[in-house]
Amino acid sequence: MGPTALAFGVLALPGATGRDLGFVLAAQAVPFILLMPLGGVLADRRSRAAVIAVSDVILGALVVVQGLLLAEGTATVPVLAALNVAAGALNALWWPAFPGLVPAILDDRDLQSGNSLVAVVSNVAFIGGSAVAGVLVATVGAGQALMVDGASFLVAGALVYSMRGVTRPTPSGESMVRDLREGWSTFVSLRWLWVLVAVWSVINGVFRGVFEVGGPVLMRRSFDGPTSWAVLQTAMAVGFLVGAAVAARLRPERPLRFLTLASFGLPTAILTLVAPAPFVVLAVAFFVVGMQIEFWGVLWPTVLQTHVPRDRLSRATAFDAFGSGVLGPVGLALSGPVIAAFGLPTFFLAAAALCALALALPLLEREVREMARIDPEPNAER
């Protein structure tokens, strides 16, 4: 619910443009990226469930405050940006902890199916949230939609907190700085990992600019605003759901090669926004993108969980998320000015070309092309 409600809440402010939306989103993305390594260290030293739960509760309160400000008509771009700085910091604690939760409670042979189940359930909620957000924004306003979204974080935090004793790691006895350095050493020693992270840094910068700024602006100009955007978000979410279900059964011998090749539908989908294509074509394109993203959502954590030492998993995941997302704020911040200077069609064309070029590069790396799938034995050591 949050992305849709926040996007149209910002765009509904007096005189607000895509540039303002990009600024608010970048305010959240910058601390999220910069603090991610620290979040990884914390998740490898503390109960991952407790880290997730506390982050959820505080984040829920922040989202409710944003909703109240929008509902009362007192919200401004600087205030929303400031609140989103805090939200980004909390997300930086949450994100590295979550991938370590699944292998802490499942046998290794069940990791892929467990990752798939998490993705399916999350996407069912995302589908419902996207639909409800569109209806709430169109009928009662973005502020009310954000308040409902914030309440969902409070409930989630309470549920996850009940698992806090299951995921308590063994303390390393080292300082946080040393743990951070060890996580970095693990990350850079895995060539396939940092190559893909570098490539996806570019792709994520493009993706966030296109789908978080360019998309909502296009919907306001050429379609029915939040209602149309909610339909496309729901189509993508259905793609997430189908992709997660399909990915549970996929056993590619070369998972990284498969994932990279499967991602070429993304630049194709961006091209449908140029003209733009008929709305039904856009919906199909968003559905396909959702499927491809969720292939990564299921298979990529499985690769990390089976190829990275378990006691360093959250730190490696943190550097993965840090590197992959570091250009996200750049994409968000630049997309508004680029759209204003060159127009939406040129913006989407350039984004599609850059995305296609970036996807081709990792196929030149042998470790990406040739890495084999690992099938864990039952009751493998965690």
Predicted regions: what they are:
Residues 1-382:
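Alpha-helical transmembrane-bundle signature of multi-pass membrane transport and export proteins
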